[in-house]
Amino acid sequence: MEKAKFKVVIVGGSITGLTLAHCLHQANIDHIVLERRHEIAPQEGASIGLWPNGGQILDQLGLYGELEKLTEPLNVMHVVYPDGFSYSNTLFRQIRERFGYPVFFMDRQKLLDVLYKTYPNKSKILVNKLVTELRQSDGAACVMTDDGSTYEGNLIVGADGVHSRLRSEIWRLADINQPGLVTAEEKQSMTVEYSCIFGISSPLPGLASGEHVNAYMNGLTVLTFHGKGGRVYWFVIQKLDRKFTYPNVPRFSLDDAERSCTALAKIRIWRDICIGHLWQAREVASMTALEENIFTTWHYQRAILLGDSIHKMTPNIGQGANSGIEDAALLASLINHLVNIQAIKQPSDLTVNRMLENFEAIRYPRMEKIYRRSKFGVRMHTRDDLFKRILGRYVIPLTKDRLAVMASQLIVDGAVLDFLPQPKRRSGPGWPKPGNCRDGQNGHKRIQYILMSIVLVAPAWVYIFSSLVW
């Protein structure tokens, strides 16, 4: 008699969750997706940037061509400072030359729509399924939903975002079975220091397709990305007056967004374009608190967290969605190895736990690096202290030709699906060559030289600047 199939229950029809569904389908691993909302791809004004590390995985899944039709590759970045100084560089063009994939921005809704419409078995993606409880026992796990349904699997995956119910359930079970495993410090480790008004606007004269503007200001930064047909994806990120601890964080309405944009309306971001123009041309917009954290408890028994449910960043370096896509690819690869290569269809609790420990051991160091870069990025863009003001205004412009090298370090060691062929377009000198890490090492050394120069020179600049001001 044939053994029961290994089954994965995915909580959350997010980009991470749907990517995992595609990956598992390619590996012929049984699964089901439970989404709490009544539709998979609502238009909420959110946008995402797809970088080569995420793009190569979607290319492996055969989805990249559909996404390219909807987008315009970014080529040029303009950086603007409060004193009127600005410079431009070809960071994005260099990224494309190094990796074979462009960087592009698109509606989050459109990416979700492509992920859903191209998925071959819609009966495995269920909506109106709010997970209320996680249960685990020897050899199995299940979740219950608010309509009374129960879904059992060998593995439960939380891809349900920053407000993850599965994360809360993991903590609840851990507190019962292993008190102290999830510490009080970890439960209070996610914080909010910034708010973000984000939106999508109709084309504006002066904001050309394929370009990006990053306006550094004191306590404020504005990011615009100009997509296909001139459509503008934008973020207005502001420093709050104090740090908040999740879940006791501010909640914002559309009225709050309007009041903020009205107050900031005359602030110029690029040439004659002001924040008010973005708001007036909006098609959709929203406002939210920006949570930041990388949790330390990634899995418990037969449940694991992916994407924003376990590592949450601000949008400044554009790696949030890409990181979730990588999570999905690595987990699918490990499951495939367990079920299809080792032929363990019904693994023990110990075997599943070892697989999840392996996942965390691989992903945590990379995500910690990306998280640190993101945390520093938003604080430099908002000129959070004197050091970052000098660094952003006087040092970074001198190293603009090296920005692609620095950005490459967040791309080059990204996870891929190890059971599917590498895409043909995954080419260029940026990727590591088999048996040869020289390019990556050289890039890392160049970054070290740049950072060492900053460390040595910046204190003198701080002293001189302080003397002039005070």
From Swiss-Prot:
Signal peptide interval: 1-23
Annotated pathway: Secondary metabolite biosynthesis; terpenoid biosynthesis
Q: Name one GO molecular function term.
A: monooxygenase activity
The UniProt entry lists membrane topology as: Single-pass membrane protein
Q: Where in the cell is it found?
A: Membrane
In the UniProt record, does the keyword Oxidoreductase occur? yes
One Pfam family from the UniProt entry? Answer: FAD_binding_3
Q: What is this protein called?
A: FAD-dependent monooxygenase nvfK
Q: Which organism is it from?
A: Aspergillus novofumigatus (strain IBT 16806)
